[in-house]
Amino acid sequence: MSDRGKCQYPDDVDVIREREYPLLKDTTYLDHAGTTLYAKSLIESFSRDLTSNLYGNPHSMSAPSQLSTQRVDDIRLRALRFFSADPEEFDLVFVANATAAIKLVADSFRESTPQGFWYGYHVDSHTSLVGARELAGIGSRCFVTDAEVESWISQLDTEPVQGPRLFAYPAQSNMNGRRFPRGWCGRIRESAKDTYTLLDVASLVSTSPFDLSDASAAPDFAVLSFYKIFGFPDLGALIVRKSAGHIFDKRKFFGGGTVDMVLTQGTQWHAKKQSSIHERLEDGTLPFHNIIALGSAFDTHERLFGSMDNISSHTRFLAKRLYDRMTTLRHYNGESVCHVYKPSHSDYTDPSTQGPILAFNLRSSQGAWIGKSEVEKMASVRNIQIRSGTLCNPGGTAASLNWSGADMLRHFGAGMRCGDDHDIMDGRPTGILRVSLGAMSNLTDIDTFMGFIEEFYVEKSPNVCALVPPLEANLTHRSGFHVESLSVYPIKSCGAFKVPDGKRWEIRREGLVWDREWCLIHQGTGTALNQKRYPRMALIRPFIDLSHGVLRVTCGSIRSPSQKTLEIPLDRENSNLTTTSLCQNSSKPSTVCGDQVIVQAYSSPTVSAFFSDFLGVPCTLARFPPQSSTRLAEPRRGLGSRKSPLRPAMPGAFPQDTPTPEAERNPILLSNESPILLISRSSVNRLNETIKSSPTTTNSTGRKKAVAADVFRANIVVAEDFPQPVSAGRPYIEDHWESLRIGPDNLHFNVLGSCQRCQMVCVDQLTGVRGEEPYSTLAKTRKSGNKIYFGRHLAISSNGDGNSVNSRTVMVGDVVTPSYYGP
């Protein structure tokens, strides 16, 4: 197995994957630092255990309870031995996760003395280690470099001691896999009294052995999460060096199972259990089923992989292969594609300095940074799972990106938040992309990921074609356009209602009447649901029945005999259908596209059950309040807007950056960004030609299929007056439109900019199935400034057509007359 490194698994890793990890069949999973994956046989083994044995609450004395106690004791000892920890020197406390273990230690230090404790932590720490500083009454310090830590250790014996000191750092950075000196723990203990170490080993233990056989060199406290190692169960541990156990003596809170006696009347007194550290700290009933599952996890892990040394060797080989390929990848002009964040002293062949994690960003041939969110979205479309952002490592990320504290505060003031898509600020990335490997990773994962980078982000020649092709001199004088179709989306992110041919439809400043007036909100969070997360929403199909004054909603396939129907009154005052009437007192905040919006939720259980049962999500219908509460669209700055990123490459193609106030803030209901979205049939046709001519991906079979225009969820589809042949069309000419007039009344519309696209366009609106097109092709053909564009945002003008607001209508077949950006 020379081509696969020094892997010594009992079976070939590809055989193990096929048998034990069927969910990896069509997925490339590269986020093992978040959690690794559980084996099929682990779940089967645990299931057999639960169905073969009766387990009771460990705090009882019955036979089932004593069986639980016995299993918990055995597995606790096995966990200690897994880390080569002598039970005479160490104890293991079961907790929810590594963060819970950190908090338990920090809380206990805070209560250990009246003045509290001093806390130091390395800048490359996980957020949870940083958070412990808020409990340090004496003060805290962030060590920015290893040299600062070394200097501090050398002076420990000369520093005045005001109380206990705790120094925390990761054994391995969860951001870039860099490994830290294990010797700090023993040296700190030797250098000063009343100074303790807290080692976060959660990232390390997923792919590497953690050896506590030398208690004198071990940390006083080590924290970890078992799901990082086994994928399941969701359980954590705090490993305590018994000589440091007195830190918990002053802990005030006590829970069930941690005391021998409690007086509740008269004198308030209790006696803590003293037989072990874990008995004093494991408050309440243990998650004994999870602990029992841990026993199955140990068995399965050893059977599949042999040892942690085997996993370390395997992942080290893969990480080195990936690192070499990423760092040698070049654009046509020799510029690097991948900027990898790795300390100069770390080496992917040396397990003492580096783990199997790669933190990086991508750059264009001209050195421009490529947005992390766009890369992650594109990877997700290709079923490649990676991580992006600050990676729960704020200090390490900021240091790698050279952001100061003042910079970060400025970004926060500008709206940047954890998990958002503010990818580039002040010309620099705000976050990092991360790929992390695990025990079941293989060379195919590496090849697939690198193929993805090469396909979408390696420039093989200069890009001489403008995204918006220049207008030909006579192009604007050729035949005109007409409205091919009109679509209203009454319920946000659900199916479309097609306006019938010959029916004139009212249009207001907020958009087409009834468009995005309703939404589905999660009953727990209040967040508006969308197809990105729930693609089956495409199968919720509303029909606007004006003659009966109802919104008629059906769910499921169009020809399904089991289709159910729900009717909602269009009139807010209509009380005929009491089971579906709007509850006027149910106004509640909801999050729509990042905005906090007040909506009115339907309180009827019938309404909630109708949607919840179909989607499998606890949700209900909500309606946007009357127009007095209308939202305002943010000004668009996309492709072809008045401030186009293409203007430097196309001088004179667009007017000056002087948007009108009307174009800046337009009223909308529950639409994402603007009142109206328009696309061109010619552009859809050209896109489909490109899709069908492109090669299929590794995971695809057969020829790529064209996509329907419906996937773009436009309100207006315009077509040219001579649809045949397709080659005679003018694709993407709408990118040059500044405004347009529609219909016999010459309704005037301002073009606000181009529509930025996300992976929601990959949801087939007829089946609710998510694919990879058209987003994959759009990413190659319609990208500008790290964003992908298709379609145009519109808003009806408040003047210029000579009609009152109430009489404005549009219809399929109406003539469309565009105005073009001037020279």
From Swiss-Prot:
Entry EC number(s): 2.8.1.9
Active-site residues, Swiss-Prot/TrEMBL: C392
Tree of life domain: Eukaryota
Keywords noted in UniProt: Molybdenum cofactor biosynthesis, Pyridoxal phosphate, Transferase
GO molecular function, one term: molybdenum cofactor sulfurtransferase activity
GO biological process: Mo-molybdopterin cofactor biosynthetic process
Domain MOSC: 644-819
Entry keyword Signal: no
Cofactor entry: pyridoxal 5'-phosphate
Residues that bear N6-(pyridoxal phosphate)lysine: K228
Short name of one Pfam family: MOSC
Chain residue ranges for the region called Disordered: 628-667
Record's keyword annotation contains Transferase: yes
Catalytic activity: Mo-molybdopterin + L-cysteine + AH2 = thio-Mo-molybdopterin + L-alanine + A + H2O
Pathway in which the depicted protein is active: Cofactor biosynthesis; molybdopterin biosynthesis
Function of the protein: Sulfurates the molybdenum cofactor. Sulfation of molybdenum is essential for xanthine dehydrogenase (XDH) and aldehyde oxidase (ADO) enzymes in which molybdenum cofactor is liganded by 1 oxygen and 1 sulfur atom in active form.
Protein family according to the UniProt entry: Belongs to the class-V pyridoxal-phosphate-dependent aminotransferase family. MOCOS subfamily.
Name by which UniProt lists this protein: Molybdenum cofactor sulfurase
Annotated gene: hxB
